[in-house]
Amino acid sequence: MLAGAEFTLYKNADCTDEAVKGITDDNGNLLFDKVEVGTYFLKETKAPAGYRKLLDPIKVEFKCVDGKHVFVVNDVVIDGNNSNENYSMTVENDWYIGNMTVINERGAKLPATGSKGTVLLVGSGIALCLIGLNKKRKNNKGEA
């Protein structure tokens, strides 16, 4: 459950025609209320500190197939027969509700810079270069 993630539902694949946006609550839930039948693209527009945004939008459709309302996620039909832990569809008070879990991952931890180890490595590299130059200089004097 991730609070503070911002998602936008777009009407086109280019994610330029905004339908509705919202921010996840303290429990990590977000409700887009009374969305019309159609095809949308869900994009994470802002991730909380320390987390990465989703790379690609998620295609979401609300439509009727053979007289049944269905919820379609990335071209996979979700109905009462094939719900799983990430996607499901329920009916409450004649409203069809598509439920979806979006997994956010923490950003990669960056290595520490400027540490004592870095100074030691750079110092060792410089020392080796100086030793090599000194040897070359001595060899050149011996040939003359």
Q: What feature does the model see in each segment?
A:
Residues 1-144:
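Solvent-exposed loop/turn and edge beta-strand elements of beta-rich ligand-binding domains
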